[in-house]
Amino acid sequence: EEQIRRNDVNDGGQRFPNGGNEPANIDIILTRGYKVGEILARHFGPDSIKPEYTYLKGDLTQAYTGKIKQFQRSFVFLNLDSKEHPAALIVFDRLTSSNQDFRKTWLLHSIEEPFIDGINITITRSRKDYNGKMINTTLFPASDNLLIKKIGGTGHEFDVMGTNHPAINLPDPATTSDESGSWRIELS
């Protein structure tokens, strides 16, 4: 049975090295379980100065507790050399949980409210003179087995399973980045 720790919030199995405390020095980083991943494969090319693609595959199993048997992520960044669509990023996760009944959920955080249209999620960044845009198209799971939820907005910035857990001592967004909280997509 799944056990919830850390203030009754489902951490998704994420492991917290050194008891969740920041490391004070390099010795702590090297000795207290901070290694959370390993590169399995990588490639880029064909031009080494301006590659058309970059491929990376990693094993991130060590970043999680016993809830996860295996987690590997592969991604390919494509330089499309286009002003309208400069790049594409393809991400493929292979995850095996220790309990097949655990619900697997992929999170995508955003500062501004995301928009959902079928299997497409659009996220923009227009405040503070930004003009970024990302369109996420979900290929797996198939649309007939896909659930996409949008969570966030006032009073739901840190909402987990229906309960908002507001952060304590957030920096003033007028003087710092406003990237904490806001919105996320849960895809399962």
PLM features per residue range, with description:
Residues 1-133, 142, 152-167, 175-188:
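Catalytic and substrate-binding regions of extracellular carbohydrate-active enzymes
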Residues 137:
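Active-site-adjacent helix/loop segment of glycosyltransferases
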Residues 140, 147-149:
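Intrinsically disordered, low-complexity regions enriched in Pro/Ser/Thr/Gly and acidic residues
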Residues 148, 168-170:
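PEST-like, low-complexity acidic/proline-rich intrinsically disordered segments
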